[in-house]
A protein has these predicted regions:
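Short helix-initiation/N-cap motifs at beta->coil->alpha
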Residues: 69-84, 198-210
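A conserved helix-loop-strand patch within extracytoplasmic ligand-binding domains
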Residues: 114-172, 255, 273-277
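Ligand-binding "clamshell"
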Residues: 105-134, 214-217, 228-242
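Short, well-ordered beta-strand elements
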Residues: 38-50, 68-74, 168-173
Length: 307
């Protein structure tokens, strides 16, 4: 009797184990058919305030509309460093500008039509890099040639052409990238026929306006959405010869990332056309001028926009 009971118990044990294994295999098969949830996505940025703000916006937007964990790797450096990090898979996305992508990355000549620039960049990034150029965020951030407000008033400066007579006595200050890129210093001075008093000072982007305010230089190349320009009483000169191409802000995302996590792309598309130049300028000033946390500034913006 005991022997039969032991045999029965042993048989039930093996049957139960086989059943559990079968159930486990079925559950694994079902899980494999479902879209992948969770995971980590890495957002990068260049080394200036607007980029850090936009990267934080991308991160919060993805976190709010997916189950993804978002890692922030901001302040990486210039355009080419971010581009290389994207291609190497060190980051999954970062904010870029269409004119920068066209000239500094693709090494193509500037164009003035925003739509043509966007579609050219989008097509080439897909073909060359397997990177998706998502729709513009809504604002253009072009280079701004900035002078002190008192100089602009005294010398009646409104356009870049207006400085030609004064440039030979002026010291200019630019970031390293502006000095090197195809749409930067060399083409700019040639287009406007400018000559300065010696070679330009190479300045860290965070020190440009301080150097101008302290009269270490007389002109700098900033960004048109910099909040400090007006706050410091400075003046951005009109690009009257339309030298600079459009620089529409766009998210750049690895195609492999979008294929793996389509919810990230859906979240980012909700940002299309949502930021005006004034809104971007105010966010930049909140960080630069009021020394507020970029994450807090972005949370307020997203709440105001119902994002």
């Amino acid at each position: 009797m005991r022997r039969r009971l032991l045999i029965a118990l042993r048989s039930n044990f093996y049957f139960a184990r086989a059943a559990l294994l079968l159930i486990g295999c079925v559950l694994l098969a079902i899980a494999g058919c479902r879209p992948q949830r969770g995971g980590t996505i890495v957002v990068g940025s260049k080394n200036f305030t607007e980029q850090i703000v936009l990267a934080e916006l991308f991160a919060q937007q993805i976190e709010a509309h997916s189950t993804l964990h978002v890692e922030r790797r901001v302040n990486l450096g210039g355009t080419l460093l971010c581009h290389q990090a994207l291609l190497a898979g060190k980051i999954d996305l970062y904010p870029e500008y269409t004119g920068t992508a066209l000239t500094a990355v693709l090494n193509e000549p500037p164009q003035n039509d925003p739509s043509a620039v966007f579609h050219r960049v989008q097509d080439q990034y897909r073909a060359r890099y397997a990177v998706e150029v998502m729709p513009p965020l809504g604002f253009n951030n072009t280079f701004a040639m900035v002078v002190r407000g008192d100089d602009a008033a005294k010398l009646h400066l409104h356009t870049i052409s207006d400085i030609r007579a004064f440039a030979p006595k002026w010291r200019a200050g630019f970031g390293y990238e502006f000095m090197e890129r195809p749409d930067g210093y060399r083409g700019w001075v040639a287009a406007y026929g400018l000559h300065f008093a010696g070679e330009p000072h190479i300045l860290d982007l965070g020190l440009l306006y301080r150097a101008l305010a302290d009269r270490q230089v007389d002109l700098v190349a900033g960004n048109s959405t910099d909040g400090l320009i007006a706050a410091l009483g400075m003046v951005a000169l009109e690009d009257d010869r339309r030298y600079f191409p459009p620089y529409e802000a766009v998210p750049l995302v690895r195609r492999a990332t979008l294929d793996k996590h389509p919810e990230a792309g859906a979240a980012l598309r909700q940002l299309t056309g949502k930021i005006t130049e004034d809104e971007m300028r105010r966010m930049n000033y909140a960080v630069d001028g009021e020394h507020r946390d970029p994450a807090e500034v972005v949370r307020e913006f997203r709440k105001a926009k119902n994002l």
